[in-house]
Amino acid sequence: MTNIRKTHPLAKIINDSFVDLPAPSNISAWWNFGSLLGICLILQILTGLFLAMHYTSDTTTAFSSVTHICRDVNYGWIIRYMHANGASMFFICLFLHVGRGLYYGSYMFPETWNIGIILLFTTMATAFMGYVLPWGQMSFWGATVITNLLSAVPYIGTDLVEWIWGGFSVDKATLTRFFAFHFILPFIILALAAIHLLFLHETGSNNPSGIPSDSDKIPFHPYYTIKDVLGALLLILMLMTLVLFSPDLLGDPDNYTPANPLSTPPHIKPEWYFLFAYAILRSIPNKLGGVLALILSILILAVVPLLHTSNQRSMMFRPLSQCLFWLLVADLLTLTWIGGQPVEYPFIAIGQLASILYFMLLLVLMPIASIIENSLLKW
């Protein structure tokens, strides 16, 4: 009798994706982040579901309902902080996953890469709307500032903003719809992740060397299942350390003050994982220009495969490109730092330089470095 996991229509899909999947024998720990993102997503959906059971999306009670969850609901505090810090872990894994893709040339799978970009945008939208729900000062003003950016759209801008708000300011209608979208989007992310995986399994995984590995494949189970379990344990260890020892480390103290439309916080800033994009937005004095730069800071990933000029796929054997890659990492860390600083000298100048360098690296310097490396190999 044939094994049921190989014959049953549903079990067969799972078997071909997680058990008998042929995987390259040399993929490193940088390939763990796909499974870690899956774990993060499931964790966020589960904790979010339990939070939604007690949360009320009304401007008068939203802040109180979150307080109620933390004070009165059984283990509500841990669910709330696991959800809030789970988002941070999610984005850490996301950035490392994208960074891995850039370094090892995984973007040469165009369908997988493009679905990944859509996933990144969707996750950022979900996180933004989730940040609005506790209805603290930073929630309210963050929502006001970011949605207001759409008013930069020529001709229809103002109408567009009021349509999203459901009125003439961020109010009850805005909060209710943000809650509805924040609830549904993770399930859309789940579906997109399945498509992401589907496209990946059409080609098979890339590997650190960037060389086709068809001649040297090993079964996913038990080798990579046990490796993923180790990654998952480390992820949960980091998350729970954060949740149990310093749950508010990555949050903003202003969000413990209920939203007040009459009092603006001294420094409006988003969560840490949006600071790099926020810094790019603020670096451009023109409103529409800033909004375009903000969108392009992520959308630029879509042109990376088109600008791949190297004869090699991976950066593993390309020292010049490696230097530029790590310069890009340092640049993004600089932008993250600048995004959290007030708009004054010298932060404005540093932010503008870092923003220019970011686009220069991806659009100009890296493709040129690849061409230089190609010519060096001909000597």
From Swiss-Prot:
Free-text cofactor note: Binds 2 heme b groups non-covalently.
Cofactor(s) needed by this chain: heme b
Instruction: List UniProt keywords, sorted A-Z.
Output: Electron transport, Heme, Iron, Membrane, Metal-binding, Mitochondrion, Mitochondrion inner membrane, Respiratory chain, Transmembrane, Transmembrane helix, Transport, Ubiquinone
What the entry lists under SUPFAM superfamilies is as follows: a domain/subunit of cytochrome bc1 complex (Ubiquinol-cytochrome c reductase) (SSF81648), Transmembrane di-heme cytochromes (SSF81342)
Transmembrane domains' residue ranges = 33-53, 77-98, 113-133, 178-198, 226-246, 288-308, 320-340, 347-367
Q: Name one Pfam family in it.
A: Cytochrom_B_C
Q: Which InterPro entries match?
A: Cyt_b/b6_C (IPR005798), Cyt_b/b6_C_sf (IPR036150), Cyt_b/b6_N (IPR005797), Cytb/b6-like_sf (IPR027387), Cytochrome_b (IPR030689), Cytochrome_b_C_euk/bac (IPR048260), Cytochrome_b_N_euk/bac (IPR048259), Di-haem_cyt_TM (IPR016174)
Annotated heme b b562 binding sites: H83, H182
Localization terms from the record? Mitochondrion inner membrane
Q: Where does heme b b566 bind?
A: H97, H196
Q: Where is coiled-coil annotated?
A: none
Q: Name one GO molecular function term.
A: ubiquinol-cytochrome-c reductase activity
Q: How does it sit in the membrane?
A: Multi-pass membrane protein
- The record lists a ubiquinone as bound by H201
Any one Gene Ontology cellular component term annotated for this protein: mitochondrial inner membrane
One GO term of the biological process aspect:
mitochondrial electron transport, ubiquinol to cytochrome c
Q: How does it assemble?
A: The cytochrome bc1 complex contains 11 subunits: 3 respiratory subunits (MT-CYB, CYC1 and UQCRFS1), 2 core proteins (UQCRC1 and UQCRC2) and 6 low-molecular weight proteins (UQCRH/QCR6, UQCRB/QCR7, UQCRQ/QCR8, UQCR10/QCR9, UQCR11/QCR10 and a cleavage product of UQCRFS1). This cytochrome bc1 complex then forms a dimer.
Indicate the family of this protein: Belongs to the cytochrome b family.
Function description: Component of the ubiquinol-cytochrome c reductase complex (complex III or cytochrome b-c1 complex) that is part of the mitochondrial respiratory chain. The b-c1 complex mediates electron transfer from ubiquinol to cytochrome c. Contributes to the generation of a proton gradient across the mitochondrial membrane that is then used for ATP synthesis.
What further fact does the record state?
Heme 1 (or BL or b562) is low-potential and absorbs at about 562 nm, and heme 2 (or BH or b566) is high-potential and absorbs at about 566 nm.
Put simply, this protein is called Cytochrome b
Lineage runs:
Eukaryota, Metazoa, Chordata, Craniata, Vertebrata
